[in-house]
Amino acid sequence: MKRLVIGICVIGAVVVGVVVRAQGSSTPARDFIPVTDAMLAKPDPGDWLMWRRTLDSWGYSPLDQINTGNVTQLTQVWSHEMGPGRAESTPLVHSGIMFIPNAGDFIQAVDARTGESIWEYKRQLPQGVGPAANRAIAIWGTTIIDASSDNMMYAIDARTGQLAWQTPVFDPKVRASAGSGPLIANGKVFTGRQCLPDGGIDTCVITAHDAKTGKELWRTRTIPKPGEPGDETWGNVPVEQRWHVGTWMVPSYDVETNRVIIGTSVTIPAPKYILGGNDKKHLYHNSTLALDADTGKIVWYYQHLVDHWDLDHPFERLLVDTAVAPDPREVTWINPKLRPGERRKVITGIPGKTGVVYTLDRQTGEFLWARPTVFQNVIQKIDGATGEVIVDPKQTFNAVGDERLVCPGTNGGKNWPAGAYSPQTNTMYYPLQNMCMTAVSNTDQRDPTKVYGLTTKYVMTPGADKVGTVWAISAETGKMVWKYEQRSGMMPLVSTGGGLIFVGDAEGKFLALDEKTGKVLWQTKLPDSISGYPIAYAVDGKEYVAVSTGTSLVGNAAAQMTPEIKTDRKPRMYVFALR
């Protein structure tokens, strides 16, 4: 296939290039249907229009052509080479086109039926700016919208790959990239940021941009300045030393309340004795935030953990309407005011690395219940009446050189590999790791190997020999429905209307589990480690399942626990369908 360079443009200090592969008149790009806000709110069953497919972050496809009865007939139908770097990506599918995000602001458009290339877009980054991982892109109108490694919000034409607009958020060389990409609702592009110390407090923000023009609409900081609400929770820590409350995963959006629901990360340094004292809350780290989508105002917050160990809580929040009847035989912490069986609009799931499931009232942030999954030793108790989380004081640090065995470790437990929710079973499904770490307190936060004030080493959870596990947990009762375990680490998963859970692992296995029992119904072994988010989509009435391989932070860490398992990590998209 001949490669044609059709556009080079210089904007400020950024050079943007587009490489397009020539296509015939039948290319799906010519028949592209613009994506509306209504389509994002209620996607066509065959489409995958955003990170977790829907604004409520379910990670659920209603497609059922591939199901428990015929999944054994699944076979690979095409694959497509991806770009270099961490391949932690989620492909989008619309109008018969698959859009594949790659590390370093490289986006590919391919025919979703065949894998044939349509166009490729590659940003030329300024000197000194490294390529960031790109877990998600967004689609609106006729544009693909993303957050770049050099701190731009930008849009490209979904039909041609040409740049449509771009808007600077910060200086290109400040380490405050988005990490996971945007979510779009009601014409607004919502994006969080990771924010390392060199950027200062003003890079720890959530932003909203106009999807049509790229104009910034608002930005909200996640660390208060003196005189602002929450300032007192930092004690006497000067504002220039308040670092790194990031929002490095994709938010959810509550249509009914017009609120952005997003999670936050740890501070830098993590040990709080270095940061004003172990008794301080340091808002809004490791919290769920509900923001007014029109103004960015924080409506409410709930803090999941005062974090001394880099156990971030930025992961997907599932927005679910369900009866709430936590079973005290399995659910450790329950709000005593809760009336069992009452129907509530909740935020649920595993928001942080601890692997603890939290269920909150979606409108107020009220704590309803919580339970652990994999072994954890950092939370001592949660006050059911107030929702206050009490950490085990024996696990905190008090001086340089203090060493602790911390479970889970910074790899989780839970990490960016997303879980899913199935409305068919009212059950949530989560890929987790049985991993802990030894952690020694240090003080040199400017050293990139010690940036969180910790020197760490991964170890297996005591008594465990299987790294990877998938937990199925009832959204109503909190009971474990089933648990699947295996030697290699688990990667993201997706649930489908066919009663299936598709999940990959660090070894390269791609599995289909029965959503009701956890039984393995089908599996295939790919040449490389699974690294991306699987999706299900349909074109011309035919259902497909896609997943990418390559290198990833979670997969690489899990592999340290299984040195006997050898696998490559070449980035590639694989697509399957029924024979």
Q: For each of these PLM feature ranges, what is it?
A:
Residues 7-17:
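Bacterial N-terminal signal peptides
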Residues 24-76, 222-229, 391-395, 459-460, ...:
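Blade/loop signatures of beta-propeller domains
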Residues 48-52, 84-106, 129-153, 177-206, ...:
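Repeat-blade elements of multi-bladed beta-propeller folds
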Residues 63-73, 102-124, 283, 293-296:
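Beta-propeller domains
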Residues 80-92, 120-141, 163-181, 221-250, ...:
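Extracytoplasmic beta-rich repeat domains
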Residues 112-114, 135-169, 174-222, 357-368:
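Hydrophobic or amphipathic alpha-helical targeting/insertion segments
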Residues 156-161, 203-216, 277-296, 359-365, ...:
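Beta-propeller blade signature
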Residues 535-579:
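Blade-level signature of beta-propeller repeat domains, shared across WD40, Kelch, NHL, RCC1
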